[in-house]
Amino acid sequence: MTVEQKSTLIVAIVGMPARGKTYTARKIARYLNWRGHDAKVFNVGNYRRKHLGAKQPATFFDPENPEGRRARKQMAMAALEDMIGWLSDGGEVAIYDATNSTRVRRGLIQKTADEHQTKLIFVESICDMPSIIEENIRETKISSPDYRGIDEQHAVTDFRKRIAFYHQAYEPLQPDEGSWVKIIDVGRQIITNEITGYLPGRIVFFLMNIHLGKRLVWLTRHGESQYNVAGKIGGDSMLSARGEKFSTALSAHFSSPKRTPSEVWTSTLHRTIQTSKHLAIPTRHIKNLDELNAGVRDGLTYEQIKSRFPEEYAARKQNKFGYRYPQGESYQDLIRRLDPIIVELERKAKPVLIVAHQAVLRALYAYLMDIPPEQCPFLDMPLHTVIQLEPKAYGCAESRTSLDSSSDSATASSILGSNGGIS
């Protein structure tokens, strides 16, 4: 099987267990997909779990165990073959997530990439910081499918043995192994070797701005605005009385020391600034967080657009992700505008609260939850609701808290979610 003559890329992850490899692989894929590239992770561990079962003892990973070594190679080859097939069928960036801990294994990946005329870069995660390794071991015990339902102490002990076996055979990347990036001590140092081309360069830039530390991200829309009440889109209106109540409730919600952002980000529009005014937290007003631009239709209701400009209304209904009102923006445009926000958000090591607008939060939420960008116009972003997100190695934990003071808050949120902003 040969990959068609087009620009394709393999990103092969390298590193010992508990160094954040899967977390990094998923982040790369998520970021590239969000930017419009077709990226997919091929995790060799998933192949092992599917075909051999998840409950393999640590001795399975002993380099002196011939049966285990043979079985692991078979799974690695199966993932590699599927990855090449996916690229041949139109995929763009394949992330090969495994330890790839020896020169022999990496040479096999390089040979495969060369045979199929696909560019290859290695991304090696190196960490000798005991505190980080310990935290990753505990996180793996909690979230890895390998240890689901296993006693905590047994899981940790077994995983430590697995790490020790990998350490016996581990060979770090060398300068003669082609294009690679080394991430040392969760981003303290980045070393690159023979990196060329737009996508590899973009990946390196992204990797320079991520970290493995835990932190919370909160998303909330501004309080109900006067335009929300009138059903109008866009504009720069002030909060309604109900929106003002939410502003006060938001401040009370974040008054707990256990739930305090290090920083608040808002747009430059009045309704987000008003919403955050009671928060005694450093606040930044960022133009890139402004609501999706409705162009010449700004200030109209959807009923007015439907009656006066039926062709535009129908065109947007047909392609909500790609359509832009005259002199306005589409969701696709918005995602490009938000790219610096995403990079800055990834860089932040401390919790952040973002007070923004429906379309903007849909796009940010889609990124953080690894939802295809094309689906973001249809995500539910109700007013007066705080969404708490906690990125983890195998996903993102979410909780939602309604701060609506009205007696029928669920109904109000549902109604306003459809017309209280750019929908």
Q: Which residues are covered by each model-predicted region?
A:
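A glycine- and Lys/Arg-enriched "phosphate-lid" helix/loop adjacent to the NTP-binding pocket
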Residues: A58-R70, T112-P172
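Phosphate-coordination/substrate-recognition cap region in phosphate-metabolizing enzymes
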Residues: A98, R103-G107, K111-T112, K119-S143, ...
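Pre-Walker A (Motif I) flank of P-loop NTPase domains
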Residues: K6-V11, G90-E92, A349-K350
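Extreme N-terminal, non-catalytic leader segments
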Residues: M1-I10, R35-D38, Y47, H211-L212
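The conserved Walker
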Residues: P17
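Acidic, low-complexity terminal tails and accessory targeting/binding regions
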Residues: M1-E4, E171-P175, S179-W180, Q189-L216, ...
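Conserved substrate/cofactor phosphate-moiety recognition/catalytic segment
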Residues: T22-I84, G90-G91, R105, M129-E134
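Hydrophobic anchor at the beta1->P-loop junction of P-loop NTPases
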Residues: I13, I354
